[in-house]
Amino acid sequence: MQVILLQRVAKLGQMGEVVNVKDGYARNYLLPQGKALRANESNIKSFEARKAQLEAQNLETKKEAAAVAEKLDGQSFVVIRSASDAGALYGSVTTRDAADAATEAGFTVDRGQVVLDRPIKELGLHTVTVTLHPEVAVKITLNVARSPEEAELQASGKSIQELAAEAEAAADFEIAELFDEIGAASQDE
C-alpha cells in the first residue's frame, strides 16, 4: 500500500514522502496513529494544501522536544528492584519502569518513547535512549538497585559484585583471625 507520511518515521522516510509499506503496517499502525494517509489523488491534494501547516506544527513540536531534551539528556534515575545476591533481577526493568522513573522526576516521558537495546535483567547502571521526537533523542541512565543506599554506592562507581567480593573477603579474614586465636589458645594450654 502506498502512503503519504505526515511526519518523519524511523527507517521509513521523511514527512511528505510517498512510500510503499505492507498493508497491515499501514492499517494497524501508520493510519490509526495519524502518521500517514493513503496515497490517492484527493489525499495528495489535501496534503499539499496542509503541508506548510504540518511543517510548522512539526517544527514547533521539535523545538519543545529539544527544550525537554536539553534538561533530560544525561540524567540518572534510580529504579529499585528485588534481586539475587549475584545481582540478577527477579523479572526485568521495562520501558514502563524507565518512563515512570522519569515522570516521577518531573519529566513527561511516555513508555513508547523509551528504547531499550536489550532487556535489563541485572543490577547496575544502564544507558537507555529516549526518543522525544522523531528527530530528537537523548540518553539517560537507569541506576537499578535493591535499595536507595545501594543506588548511591553504584552511582559513586562501585558495582554490586565488587561490594559482595569485599564483604566476602572481610568475612574470610575474620574467620582466619578467629582460627588463629583458637589455635594460639590451644597451644597455651
Curated annotation (Swiss-Prot):
Under Gene Ontology molecular function, one entry of this record is: structural constituent of ribosome
Which InterPro entries does UniProt cross-reference here?
Ribosomal_bL9 (IPR000244), Ribosomal_bL9/RNase_H1_N (IPR009027), Ribosomal_bL9_bac/chp (IPR020594), Ribosomal_bL9_C (IPR020069), Ribosomal_bL9_C_sf (IPR036791), Ribosomal_bL9_N (IPR020070), Ribosomal_bL9_N_sf (IPR036935)
Q: Spell out the protein name for this chain.
A: Large ribosomal subunit protein bL9
Query: Could you tell me which Gene3D superfamilies the record lists for this protein?
Result: Ribosomal protein L9, C-terminal domain, Ribosomal protein L9, N-terminal domain
Q: Which PANTHER family match?
A: 50S RIBOSOMAL PROTEIN L9 (PTHR21368)
UniProt lists the family membership as follows:
Belongs to the bacterial ribosomal protein bL9 family.
Please tell me one Gene Ontology term that the record gives under cellular component. ribonucleoprotein complex
Q: What domain of life does the native source organism fall in?
A: Bacteria
GO biological-process terms attached to the record: translation
| Record's keyword terms, sorted | Ribonucleoprotein, Ribosomal protein, RNA-binding, rRNA-binding
| Protein purpose | Binds to the 23S rRNA.
Question: Has keyword rRNA-binding?
Answer: yes
